[in-house]
């Protein structure tokens, strides 16, 4: 996850660059980017630590980590992109929001179509709100069959620097 204090550089993407980025996001996430108007303008930012982020209206909506673009929780909350979900029980919420990886015993349900290495949203069972974005270590069937172990590696969660930076922009 990028360490964000300020941006080294920040610039608007050209229409062609924006289309290329959206195509890349849709290809990597296997999900459609929606909720964007026709005049939507993305910005690209480079943080102090060299991490690359995409902004929409001053809010970070995607960040690059290990060569892959991930949606932020704000992008999920705003309906910009919809990715497969893994629902966790309320007992796991405290750990997930502190950045813990997701363990199989805390999972209540799993969306179909998750493949090993897929980017997934971790949501709570009561409110259905996203708590974290991570990478699945198993397919949907594997997740359902597993009885223990780490099943999602957390990359971004409520309360981390990326989340806090987004709060300061609002």
In which residue ranges do the predicted regions lie?
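Beta-strand/loop-dominated core regions that host nucleotide or nucleotide-derived cofactor-binding catalytic loops
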Residues: 2-51, 56-59, 64-108, 113-116, ...
């Amino acid at each position: 996850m990028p360490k964000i204090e300020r941006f080294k550089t920040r610039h608007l993407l050209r229409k062609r660059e924006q289309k290329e980025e959206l195509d890349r996001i849709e290809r990597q996430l296997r999900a459609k980017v929606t909720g964007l108007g026709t005049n939507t303008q993305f910005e690209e930012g480079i943080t102090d630590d060299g991490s690359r982020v995409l902004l929409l209206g001053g809010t970070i909506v995607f960040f690059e980590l290990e060569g892959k673009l991930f949606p932020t929780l704000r992008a999920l909350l705003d309906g910009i992109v919809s990715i497969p979900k893994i629902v966790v029980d309320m007992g796991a919420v405290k750990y997930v929001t502190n950045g813990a990886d997701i363990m199989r015993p805390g999972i209540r349900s799993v969306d179909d179509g998750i493949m090993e290495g897929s980017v997934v949203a971790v949501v709570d069972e009561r409110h259905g709100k996203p708590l974290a974005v991570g990478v699945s270590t198993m397919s949907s069937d594997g997740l359902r069959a597993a009885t223990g172990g780490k099943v999602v590696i957390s990359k971004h969660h409520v309360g981390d620097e990326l989340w806090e930076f987004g709060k300061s922009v609002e």
